[in-house]
Amino acid sequence: GHGVAHIGGVHEAPNGFRWRIVPERNDSCVLEEGMITTDEPGIYVEGSHGIRTENELLCVKGNANEYGQFMHFEALTMAPIDLDAVLPENMTAAEKKYLNDYHALVREKLSPYFDEEESRWLAHVTRAI
């Protein structure tokens, strides 16, 4: 993932996530309240193709204790994940719960703006797996 600018580059420092630290990118900072970061799970088949589902997340304060201030993320992107591309049998219980909770949030946030037919479509594409 990476930071997001309002009117600027797609990859906005200083926040970012990678499988390894890349010092010259200057995007391995401590996350702060209010930062927007992308979450980009995907699959890449070397030499062939790749696909990502990219959502934007807001960093918010969570619990504080003797170890410090903990942060968590709230989803900003409200769009269904294509369930035709999901293999539930390859997912852990925690991953299924995350997807089902996200889809419930998408329904909650979007359904007030949809008519009856659109709401039926939304219910179908955000059904629990």
Predicted regions and their residues:
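Charged, cofactor-coupling segments
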Residues: 3-129
